């Protein structure tokens, strides 16, 4: 039941944030009740306190920026190690002009020379 309570309160917080409504425990509880989900009474209060201390929009936008991918290159992991507060702009790859590949014409490796 606790995972259902967490999920319902998470959705309620996202709805309130998206609508620009102040996030309070009463409003979270009202939304969850309107959805027909039964939760423990402490969940709305916990989520309301979390929303007071954190910017919910930043939390939503940085969901995928967290660590966890142990095989990622070091340069890509640096923004996540810095707290993930700002997403780093992807580095532009410079295209190097490579010489055109020469044909296999006369390299001395002919099979029937």
UniProtKB/Swiss-Prot annotation:
One of its GO terms (molecular function) is structural constituent of ribosome. The keyword Ribonucleoprotein applies. It holds the Pfam family Ribosomal_60s. GO terms for cellular component: cytosol; cytosolic ribosome; ribonucleoprotein complex. Keywords: Phosphoprotein, Ribonucleoprotein, Ribosomal protein. The modification Phosphoserine is found at residue 103. It comes from the Eukaryota. One of its GO terms (biological process) is translational elongation. Residues 87-113 are annotated as: Disordered. InterPro entries: P1/P2_N_sf (IPR038716), Ribosomal_P1/P2 (IPR027534). Belongs to the eukaryotic ribosomal protein P1/P2 family. Plays an important role in the elongation step of protein synthesis. P1 and P2 exist as dimers at the large ribosomal subunit. This is Large ribosomal subunit protein P1z.
């Amino acid at each position: 039941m606790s995972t259902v309570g967490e999920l319902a309160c998470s959705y309620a917080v996202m709805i309130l944030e998206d609508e620009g409504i102040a996030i309070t425990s009463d409003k979270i509880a009202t939304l969850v009740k309107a959805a027909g989900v039964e939760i423990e009474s402490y969940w709305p209060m916990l989520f309301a306190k979390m929303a007071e201390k954190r910017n919910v929009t930043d939390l939503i936008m940085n969901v995928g920026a967290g660590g966890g991918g142990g095989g990622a290159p070091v340069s890509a992991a640096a923004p996540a190690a810095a707290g993930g507060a700002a997403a780093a702009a992807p580095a532009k790859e410079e295209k190097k002009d490579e010489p055109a590949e020469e044909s296999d014409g006369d390299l001395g490796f002919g099979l029937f020379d």
